[in-house]
Protein backbone atom coordinates (compact mmCIF):
# COMPACT_ATOMS: atom_id res chain seq x y z
CA UNK A 1 0.00 0.00 0.00
CA UNK A 2 1.12 3.46 1.03
CA UNK A 3 1.16 6.60 -1.00
CA UNK A 4 3.89 7.37 -3.50
CA UNK A 5 5.00 10.90 -4.30
CA UNK A 6 6.09 11.06 -7.92
CA UNK A 7 6.69 14.80 -7.98
CA UNK A 8 3.25 15.75 -9.28
CA UNK A 9 1.45 14.65 -6.15
CA UNK A 10 0.70 11.74 -3.86
CA UNK A 11 -0.79 8.76 -5.65
CA UNK A 12 -1.90 5.39 -4.33
CA UNK A 13 0.96 2.91 -4.31
CA UNK A 14 0.46 -0.21 -6.42
CA UNK A 15 -0.87 -3.47 -4.99
CA UNK A 16 2.03 -5.61 -3.79
CA UNK A 17 0.54 -9.13 -3.54
CA UNK A 18 0.54 -11.39 -6.58
CA UNK A 19 -2.82 -12.33 -8.08
CA UNK A 20 -2.53 -15.78 -6.49
CA UNK A 21 -1.92 -14.25 -3.05
CA UNK A 22 -4.80 -11.81 -3.55
CA UNK A 23 -7.16 -14.64 -4.43
CA UNK A 24 -6.04 -16.56 -1.34
CA UNK A 25 -6.75 -13.52 0.83
CA UNK A 26 -10.19 -13.14 -0.77
CA UNK A 27 -10.93 -16.83 -0.12
CA UNK A 28 -9.96 -16.45 3.54
CA UNK A 29 -12.36 -13.53 3.94
CA UNK A 30 -15.10 -15.48 2.14
CA UNK A 31 -14.54 -18.45 4.44
CA UNK A 32 -14.87 -16.21 7.53
CA UNK A 33 -18.08 -14.73 6.10
CA UNK A 34 -19.58 -18.12 5.10
CA UNK A 35 -19.65 -17.06 1.46
CA UNK A 36 -19.01 -19.20 -1.62
CA UNK A 37 -15.30 -19.36 -2.49
CA UNK A 38 -14.15 -17.59 -5.64
CA UNK A 39 -12.21 -19.78 -8.06
CA UNK A 40 -10.45 -16.81 -9.66
CA UNK A 41 -10.03 -13.05 -9.53
CA UNK A 42 -12.93 -11.64 -11.50
CA UNK A 43 -11.36 -9.06 -13.79
CA UNK A 44 -13.17 -6.36 -15.74
CA UNK A 45 -12.13 -3.86 -18.39
CA UNK A 46 -11.88 -1.35 -15.58
CA UNK A 47 -9.73 -3.20 -13.03
CA UNK A 48 -8.18 -6.55 -12.19
CA UNK A 49 -9.48 -6.33 -8.61
CA UNK A 50 -13.27 -6.11 -8.24
CA UNK A 51 -14.82 -6.75 -4.84
CA UNK A 52 -18.55 -6.94 -4.13
CA UNK A 53 -20.05 -5.91 -0.80
CA UNK A 54 -23.72 -6.84 -0.62
CA UNK A 55 -25.77 -4.76 1.81
CA UNK A 56 -29.51 -4.22 1.90
CA UNK A 57 -30.77 -0.65 1.67
CA UNK A 58 -31.06 0.85 5.13
CA UNK A 59 -28.25 -1.21 6.68
CA UNK A 60 -25.70 1.62 6.81
CA UNK A 61 -23.98 1.17 3.45
CA UNK A 62 -22.63 4.74 3.22
CA UNK A 63 -21.24 4.60 6.76
CA UNK A 64 -19.66 1.24 5.93
CA UNK A 65 -17.75 2.48 2.90
CA UNK A 66 -16.61 5.69 4.60
CA UNK A 67 -15.19 3.53 7.41
CA UNK A 68 -13.57 1.30 4.76
CA UNK A 69 -11.78 4.37 3.37
CA UNK A 70 -10.28 5.13 6.79
CA UNK A 71 -9.35 1.48 7.39
CA UNK A 72 -7.62 1.15 4.00
CA UNK A 73 -5.72 4.32 4.77
CA UNK A 74 -4.74 3.12 8.26
CA UNK A 75 -3.68 -0.37 7.19
CA UNK A 76 -2.21 0.23 3.72
CA UNK A 77 -1.59 3.98 3.47
CA UNK A 78 -3.87 4.49 0.46
CA UNK A 79 -5.29 8.00 0.39
CA UNK A 80 -7.07 8.61 -2.94
CA UNK A 81 -10.68 7.48 -3.15
CA UNK A 82 -13.48 8.23 -5.58
CA UNK A 83 -17.10 7.48 -4.69
CA UNK A 84 -19.17 7.05 -7.86
CA UNK A 85 -22.93 7.43 -7.51
CA UNK A 86 -25.88 7.05 -9.92
CA UNK A 87 -27.55 10.43 -9.37
CA UNK A 88 -27.13 13.99 -8.13
CA UNK A 89 -29.51 13.31 -5.22
CA UNK A 90 -27.38 10.39 -3.97
CA UNK A 91 -24.22 12.46 -4.55
CA UNK A 92 -25.55 15.19 -2.24
CA UNK A 93 -26.55 12.57 0.36
CA UNK A 94 -23.07 11.04 0.34
CA UNK A 95 -21.43 14.46 0.74
CA UNK A 96 -23.74 15.12 3.70
CA UNK A 97 -22.77 11.76 5.26
CA UNK A 98 -19.07 12.58 4.89
CA UNK A 99 -19.73 15.90 6.61
CA UNK A 100 -21.76 14.58 9.55
CA UNK A 101 -19.51 11.57 10.27
CA UNK A 102 -16.26 13.61 10.16
CA UNK A 103 -16.02 14.15 13.93
CA UNK A 104 -16.96 10.54 14.65
CA UNK A 105 -14.17 9.18 12.44
CA UNK A 106 -11.73 11.79 13.74
CA UNK A 107 -12.12 10.25 17.21
CA UNK A 108 -11.21 6.78 15.93
CA UNK A 109 -8.64 7.54 13.23
CA UNK A 110 -7.32 10.93 14.40
CA UNK A 111 -7.66 12.42 10.95
CA UNK A 112 -10.29 13.96 8.72
CA UNK A 113 -10.97 13.12 5.10
CA UNK A 114 -10.78 16.02 2.69
CA UNK A 115 -13.77 15.56 0.40
CA UNK A 116 -15.36 17.42 -2.48
CA UNK A 117 -17.98 16.99 -5.17
CA UNK A 118 -16.42 16.92 -8.64
CA UNK A 119 -17.36 19.97 -10.67
CA UNK A 120 -15.80 20.60 -14.08
CA UNK A 121 -15.88 24.35 -13.35
CA UNK A 122 -14.03 24.09 -10.02
CA UNK A 123 -10.91 22.15 -10.85
CA UNK A 124 -8.82 23.61 -8.01
CA UNK A 125 -10.42 20.90 -5.84
CA UNK A 126 -9.01 18.25 -8.16
CA UNK A 127 -5.60 19.92 -7.95
CA UNK A 128 -5.70 19.63 -4.15
CA UNK A 129 -6.96 16.03 -4.40
CA UNK A 130 -3.69 15.16 -6.17
CA UNK A 131 -1.25 17.28 -4.22
CA UNK A 132 -2.55 16.64 -0.70
CA UNK A 133 -0.97 13.79 1.28
CA UNK A 134 -3.97 13.17 3.56
CA UNK A 135 -7.12 11.12 2.99
CA UNK A 136 -8.82 12.56 -0.09
CA UNK A 137 -12.29 11.65 -1.32
CA UNK A 138 -13.94 12.80 -4.52
CA UNK A 139 -17.67 12.23 -4.99
CA UNK A 140 -18.84 12.09 -8.60
CA UNK A 141 -22.13 11.21 -10.27
CA UNK A 142 -21.98 9.11 -13.46
CA UNK A 143 -23.47 11.88 -15.58
CA UNK A 144 -20.35 13.99 -14.95
CA UNK A 145 -18.18 11.65 -17.06
CA UNK A 146 -20.76 9.84 -19.14
CA UNK A 147 -23.18 12.42 -20.51
CA UNK A 148 -22.67 14.31 -23.73
CA UNK A 149 -23.30 17.90 -22.61
CA UNK A 150 -20.59 20.56 -22.93
CA UNK A 151 -19.83 20.60 -19.18
CA UNK A 152 -19.69 16.81 -19.02
CA UNK A 153 -17.18 16.59 -21.87
CA UNK A 154 -14.76 18.90 -20.06
CA UNK A 155 -13.41 15.99 -18.01
CA UNK A 156 -11.84 14.57 -21.22
CA UNK A 157 -10.65 17.87 -22.72
CA UNK A 158 -7.36 19.74 -22.44
CA UNK A 159 -8.39 22.87 -20.60
CA UNK A 160 -6.75 26.28 -20.69
CA UNK A 161 -8.00 26.94 -17.16
CA UNK A 162 -6.32 23.72 -15.98
CA UNK A 163 -2.79 24.28 -17.32
CA UNK A 164 -3.68 22.60 -20.64
CA UNK A 165 -4.28 19.30 -18.86
CA UNK A 166 -7.23 16.94 -19.08
CA UNK A 167 -8.99 16.47 -15.72
CA UNK A 168 -9.28 12.73 -16.44
CA UNK A 169 -5.48 12.42 -16.75
CA UNK A 170 -4.98 14.10 -13.39
CA UNK A 171 -7.55 11.75 -11.82
CA UNK A 172 -5.93 8.67 -13.41
CA UNK A 173 -2.43 9.65 -12.25
CA UNK A 174 -3.63 9.12 -8.66
CA UNK A 175 -4.50 5.43 -9.25
CA UNK A 176 -7.64 5.98 -7.13
CA UNK A 177 -9.63 3.29 -5.35
CA UNK A 178 -13.15 3.43 -6.76
CA UNK A 179 -16.19 2.89 -4.56
CA UNK A 180 -19.35 2.31 -6.59
CA UNK A 181 -22.57 3.05 -4.72
CA UNK A 182 -25.43 1.02 -6.26
CA UNK A 183 -23.53 -0.05 -9.42
CA UNK A 184 -26.57 -1.90 -10.78
CA UNK A 185 -28.13 1.53 -11.35
CA UNK A 186 -25.16 2.53 -13.52
CA UNK A 187 -24.61 -0.63 -15.52
CA UNK A 188 -26.42 0.64 -18.58
CA UNK A 189 -24.33 0.15 -21.69
CA UNK A 190 -20.89 1.69 -21.51
CA UNK A 191 -21.28 3.68 -18.29
CA UNK A 192 -19.06 1.52 -16.11
CA UNK A 193 -16.66 0.68 -18.92
CA UNK A 194 -15.78 4.37 -19.16
CA UNK A 195 -14.39 4.12 -15.61
CA UNK A 196 -11.34 2.47 -17.18
CA UNK A 197 -10.20 6.05 -17.88
CA UNK A 198 -9.86 6.58 -14.12
CA UNK A 199 -7.12 3.88 -13.99
CA UNK A 200 -8.36 2.57 -10.62
CA UNK A 201 -6.16 0.52 -8.33
CA UNK A 202 -9.27 -1.53 -7.46
CA UNK A 203 -13.05 -1.28 -7.57
CA UNK A 204 -15.30 -1.87 -4.54
CA UNK A 205 -18.99 -2.28 -5.35
CA UNK A 206 -21.57 -1.64 -2.62
CA UNK A 207 -25.11 -2.70 -3.43
CA UNK A 208 -28.19 -4.57 -2.22
CA UNK A 209 -28.49 -6.37 -5.55
CA UNK A 210 -25.56 -7.02 -7.85
CA UNK A 211 -26.57 -7.58 -11.46
CA UNK A 212 -23.06 -8.74 -12.25
CA UNK A 213 -21.15 -10.59 -9.55
CA UNK A 214 -17.41 -10.34 -8.99
CA UNK A 215 -15.46 -11.47 -5.91
CA UNK A 216 -18.04 -11.16 -3.13
CA UNK A 217 -16.42 -10.50 0.23
CA UNK A 218 -19.34 -9.44 2.42
CA UNK A 219 -23.07 -9.95 2.61
CA UNK A 220 -25.43 -8.27 5.05
CA UNK A 221 -29.14 -8.75 4.52
CA UNK A 222 -31.97 -7.03 6.37
CA UNK A 223 -32.38 -9.93 8.82
CA UNK A 224 -28.66 -9.95 9.69
CA UNK A 225 -28.78 -6.20 10.20
CA UNK A 226 -31.88 -6.48 12.36
CA UNK A 227 -30.32 -9.22 14.47
CA UNK A 228 -27.09 -7.27 14.89
CA UNK A 229 -29.03 -4.19 16.00
CA UNK A 230 -31.01 -6.38 18.39
CA UNK A 231 -27.83 -7.90 19.82
CA UNK A 232 -26.43 -4.38 20.26
CA UNK A 233 -29.61 -3.21 22.01
CA UNK A 234 -29.71 -6.25 24.30
CA UNK A 235 -26.07 -5.84 25.30
CA UNK A 236 -26.66 -2.15 26.05
CA UNK A 237 -29.71 -3.00 28.18
CA UNK A 238 -27.66 -5.64 29.97
CA UNK A 239 -24.83 -3.21 30.69
CA UNK A 240 -27.13 -0.43 31.89
CA UNK A 241 -29.11 -2.62 34.30
CA UNK A 242 -28.09 -1.92 37.89
CA UNK A 243 -26.74 -4.99 39.63
CA UNK A 244 -29.23 -6.24 42.20
CA UNK A 245 -28.25 -8.26 45.23
CA UNK A 246 -29.77 -11.75 45.15
Please place each PLM-identified region on the residue numbering:
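Walker A/P-loop
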Residues: 47-67
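Walker A/P-loop NTP-binding motif
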Residues: 63-77
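Conserved nucleic-acid-binding Ia/Ib motif block in the N-terminal RecA-like helicase ATPase lobe
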Residues: 95-136
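Conserved RecA-like ASCE ATPase "motif II neighborhood" in helicase/translocase motors
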Residues: 123-128, 137-175, 186-193
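Walker B catalytic acidic pair
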Residues: 181-182
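Post-DEXD/H (motif II) to motif III coupling segment of the RecA-like Helicase ATP-binding lobe
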Residues: 188-234
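Conserved Walker A/P-loop ATP-binding site and its immediately adjacent core
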Residues: 79-102
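Single conserved hydrophobic/aromatic residue that forms the stacking wall/gate
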Residues: 238-246
Amino acid sequence: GSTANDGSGFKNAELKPTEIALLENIKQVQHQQNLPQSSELVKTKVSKVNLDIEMETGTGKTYCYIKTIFELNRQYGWSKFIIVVPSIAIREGVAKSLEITAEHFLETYHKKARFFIYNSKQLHHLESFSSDAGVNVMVINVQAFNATGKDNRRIYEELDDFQSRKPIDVIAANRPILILDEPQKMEGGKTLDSLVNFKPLMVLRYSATHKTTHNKIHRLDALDAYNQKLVKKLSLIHISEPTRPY
